[in-house]
Amino acid sequence: MDTASHSLVLLQQLNMQREFGFLCDCTVAIGDVYFKAHRAVLAAFSNYFKMIFIHQTSECIKIQPTDIQPDIFSYLLHIMYTGKGPKQIVDHSRLEEGIRFLHADYLSHIATEMNQVFSPETVQSSNLYGIQISTTQKTVVKQGLEVKEAPSSNSGNRAAVQGDHPQLQLSLAIGLDDGTADQQRACPATQALEEHQKPPVSIKQERCDPESVISQSHPSPSSEVTGPTFTENSVKIHLCHYCGERFDSRSNLRQHLHTHVSGSLPFGVPASILESNDLGEVHPLNENSEALECRRLSSFIVKENEQQPDHTNRGTTEPLQISQVSLISKDTEPVELNCNFSFSRKRKMSCTICGHKFPRKSQLLEHMYTHKGKSYRYNRCQRFGNALAQRFQPYCDSWSDVSLKSSRLSQEHLDLPCALESELTQENVDTILVE
């Protein structure tokens, strides 16, 4: 076998591999047309590809159609693999621009000679030897599909396969030496018509930039998980410590507390709470100390009721309800009205006699009086909590002792709420608002 025939066999085998994308290690993407090729062949004829392959490891080379048109690149690619130009004519100026872009000086004289041999009457076909994606459906076709078709000589079978699969149009070179002029007129014309009618759609590249493709098609699960987690953590519930109502923002809670201060809601709120930094935050309380306070309060009420005689003449004044009293303080706030006090149903105080639970100490205090059938004498001070309850002890003891000795002294103790009020006024309690 001589060298010429050996080289011809090698070129034919390489060209056949290129036709079917077999053993091709490079893809050239020009617009929506993809050409399979071998790096060694491209680098041998084009300095442009040679420099790209030196500095870039990607298997897909993207070229803008404004730099070189797909039909011009297919024309030059056919010359690279066969040493002969296809039987078609292309615009000479566009051909020269494509050769200059690829820096393929060796192909310049061959392409010019081949282009001048054919007369202008020769059919101008696209002669694309690449995979072109043109479809009316919004389907994504992966570039790595292997298209199994008949050999290049059987053009009729190719047209049938292309008709059966309109979503994947494989435009193969028709202008080979073994093809006739009729075959050139049939297939390329129909292909060009379908190309104009069907809009191109982008495809996912399978072999080139696998990491970027995966990141685009499959978003990271961390971004999907952190989205709802961030929104859940960003929502903070603010709790009103006096009525238990919840708010999603600090400003809404502050407006709600203003309604407590103004007296439009039953529970009074110290005005200084509105300036607190930890407004609406819940702090845990010691349950043991809470239970101790409840026991002390219950024992105090039982002891006071055992020592106190019945005073039926004191029932002329109707006791005030809890909802009718609100307190505004400026210096020392009562224990119950501290902004760290958490109004929670889990910490209800139970009655030691009947077991009934109450959310507030004042309600439990009033309830303990109902067991003895007496009115709540300290209704004007029920918002003060255990701190002021301890102050009542000397008054209650002295009142019960004197009432047993003399009815005259018991009559003087009828003004005990007034005395308590004057004492509280001296201790920086500004006003007691009665609705």
Curated annotation (Swiss-Prot):
Keyword line: DNA-binding, Isopeptide bond, Metal-binding, Nucleus, Repeat, Transcription, Transcription regulation, Ubl conjugation, Zinc, Zinc-finger
Main location per the UniProt record: nucleus
Disulfide links within the chain: none
GO biological process, one term: negative regulation of transcription by RNA polymerase II
Compartment list: Nucleus
GO molecular function: DNA-binding transcription factor activity; DNA-binding transcription repressor activity, RNA polymerase II-specific; RNA polymerase II cis-regulatory region sequence-specific DNA binding; zinc ion binding
GO cellular component: nucleoplasm
Tissue and organ distribution: Expressed mainly in hematopoietic cells and testis.
KW DNA-binding (keyword) present: yes
BTB domain boundaries: 1-107
UniProt KW Cell membrane keyword: no
Covalent link (Glycyl lysine isopeptide (Lys-Gly) (interchain with G-Cter in SUMO2)) residue numbers: K142, K148, K198, K204, K303, K330, K405
PROSITE patterns: BTB, ZINC_FINGER_C2H2_1, ZINC_FINGER_C2H2_2
Zinc finger map (C2H2-type): 238-260, 349-371
Free-text function comment from the UniProt entry: May be involved in transcriptional regulation.
Protein name in the entry: Zinc finger and BTB domain-containing protein 25
Provenance organism: Homo sapiens
Lineage, top ranks: Eukaryota, Metazoa, Chordata, Craniata, Vertebrata
